[in-house]
Amino acid sequence: MGMRMFASFDEFVEERSTALLRTAFLLTGDRGHAEDLLQTTLLRTLRRWSKARAAPEAYARRVLVNLSKDRLRARGRQPRETALPPDGPDLPSVDAGYDRIADRGAVLDALAGLPPGQRQVVVLRFVEDLSVDQTADLLDCSAGTVKSQTARALTRLRELLADFHGSQHEKETTDVRR
């Protein structure tokens, strides 16, 4: 993601709020919390626009992640698992290729099943496309922690998705036999 200068806060919101909402949803697993998180993030970014203007997306992302971590600490539990959100223009897919995944719901459910730290790492590394070092900086941890959390998360996602594909295969086999 290249650095882009925005002429105004309004332009920034118009161009980037949908992507920030997607990230908030993937971090929280809950549409309502994601919308609240986005609103608070944008408000804090606006209040500090003179500081944020140089790199507003990075600034807003940091606020978003910090608010998400604060929410998790306050609740003392991982995000609520959620079903696939309703489709709509205000919550786009991760990228064009993501729409082609037939098992989008399974991917979102598997992501929701990860512990908060692993979920954050996966979202930041693979959805936001941040490097290990950028992710570590954003989460205030070491690069080694990001790498180990990523490895654990990917292993768990493979297990969860293998379970899904196994149950789908059993269902298809049963349906054919009927």
Which ranges hold each PLM region?
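A short, charge-rich alpha-helical start-of-domain segment used by transcription regulators
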Residues: M1-R22, G32-E35
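DNA-recognition helix of helix-turn-helix
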Residues: V65, K69, L139-F164
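Structural recognition of an alpha-helix C-terminal capping motif at a helix-to-coil junction
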Residues: D36-L43, A54-N66
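Arg/Lys-rich amphipathic alpha helix in sigma70-family domain 2
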Residues: K51, A55, V65-L84, D99-R100
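C-terminal edge and immediately downstream basic/flexible tail or linker adjoining helix-turn-helix-like DNA-binding
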Residues: G2-S8, D137, L154-R178
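A short pre-motif secondary-structure segment
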Residues: V121-R125
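Conserved RNAP core-binding helix
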Residues: L21, R31-R48
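Internal acidic/polar
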Residues: Q78-R104, S131, E170-R177
